[in-house]
């Protein structure tokens, strides 16, 4: 029996033009926008009363480290800048197990879903002995929860003994990394418009990966048609490292390795000059802004307005839950709005800009602008519905603005590919209390030694 199309009727607010009376979803796709004063042209629709809901395109998280939910507010890492912060946490992350990663990934993806996120990336680059199937574990969790993912096969092969930052216990050799990258692409990477799982390649950073691995990874991505991701220009320390070890600035090094192109998106992108921004724009390279992490680690502030003015796409990412200490993308939207409004002023940054970074901008980062990030006919039915019933929203008159300026943090309903994965503020089938208990045990175990 064919499932009836669903009309999300008369939303309180919706981030789409010409959809004042809602949208119609059939299967996994948006098939109709219903304008003011009209009814659906689609026959025999089921109805969801959206009159209490403000409807957004599903938010898209373009930088994260799921495993780091296990080291939130870790005493060893508080009040540190990036390099000392990493050095404090690498030994703890070296104790990760498949079970602890499963718990960490479940917490991260559940928190993202509950914040209105329908697509997330993850950058997993720590592979201690026994954790060789980390990405497979993340795929399993994503499928259980129903969230759309782009999982990046991270890597580190430049350890402390070779002049890098990480200890030997969390790095792998280049041959192992490249072989596993090929395996994951062959097994999981889906190129269809409805893809629920995709794979990208993501050497961690210039200070943890050899030049040869960076170059080989770019060649593999070109051959297999997948995207590239890495941290770049996050801190002044990174710039100094590149100048000392490579004899050039981080973006120059990236270009030398074959990475400056339209399949690449970069995390952070704080310490770029105007000429570098112009080069990235010309190449089609995108940047993910991570405001909470950048503030907590005092790394600096991404030049989002200069980037967009140059023609670059800017996305949004929560970054790791040990630097951000949260996996809430709606809160990240507000953080980006406040941080960039303070920098650029009221005429250059609005709440809609911040929402655009988390939707259309993020979709561009992962190469999926044709599928997700907008409410439009033909797009995947990925939607986040928020109510304004909480005390924090009382008196709010603009429902779209209220989500950002009043601090929305939890969606009431979330749809991914036409399927409800959050209902009444909960994830069906997921025992949150049991998950928290399991996750806390795993976190304490990592810190016990």
Listing of model-derived features with the role each one plays in the protein:
Residues 256-263, 305-390, 405-406:
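His/Asp/Glu-enriched, well-ordered alpha-helical/loop segment
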Residues 73-123, 128-148, 179-193, 440-448:
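Alpha-helical scaffold segments that flank or form the walls of functional sites
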Residues 130-269:
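Metal-coordinating catalytic core of metallo-dependent amide/deamination hydrolases
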Residues 11, 23, 28, 52, ...:
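Divalent metal-coordination and catalytic microenvironments
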Residues 1-21, 25-27, 31, 359-449:
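Active-site microenvironment of metallo-dependent hydrolases
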Residues 272, 276-284, 291-296:
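Long hydrophobic segments that form regular secondary structure
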Residues 73, 236-248, 276-281, 298-308, ...:
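Histidine/acidic-residue-rich catalytic or RNA/ligand-binding cores of hydrolases
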